Amino acid sequence: MAKLDKNQLIESLKEMTIMEIDEIIKAVEEAFGVSATPVVAAGAVGGTQEAASEVTVKVTGYTDNAKLAVLKLYREIAGVGLMEAKTAVEKLPCVVKQDIKPEEAEELKKRFVEVGATVEIK
């Protein structure tokens, strides 16, 4: 197997999606028995906020011609039937997924924005 240098590895990572990079991180953690979770220094109280570990993705709007595409994508991601998806998309804002990782939320937001939706992550 050809050995990659640091720059080649970084260039390869630039071409990947967040989800692919997350899978690589998990594989490295497992292979080497380490964790990529940052260590919080003892005594560091207040002053800084921790990044949200779980977030909620909401569709807050969509362009005039994007309703059908948003409905189809909502249905696919939320795993609901046509009528439930139609009701949710017509009564905005609607929660797509909740208690998910920020990386997954960004990926979902990207997919919805591509079809013409406005998305909020909280």
Curated annotation (Swiss-Prot):
CDD domains listed in its UniProt record: Ribosomal_L7_L12 (cd00387)
Subunit structure: Homodimer. Part of the ribosomal stalk of the 50S ribosomal subunit. Forms a multimeric L10(L12)X complex, where L10 forms an elongated spine to which 2 to 4 L12 dimers bind in a sequential fashion. Binds GTP-bound translation factors.
PANTHER family, per database record: 39S RIBOSOMAL PROTEIN L12, LARGE RIBOSOMAL SUBUNIT PROTEIN BL12M
Signal sequence, start to end: none
Keywords: Ribonucleoprotein, Ribosomal protein
GO BP terms: translation
Originating gene: rplL
A Pfam family that the UniProt record links to this protein: Ribosomal_L12
Family: Belongs to the bacterial ribosomal protein bL12 family.
Name of this protein: Large ribosomal subunit protein bL12
Function: Forms part of the ribosomal stalk which helps the ribosome interact with GTP-bound translation factors. Is thus essential for accurate translation.
A cellular-component GO term for this protein: cytosolic large ribosomal subunit
Sample GO molecular function, one term: structural constituent of ribosome
Highest taxon above the source species: Bacteria
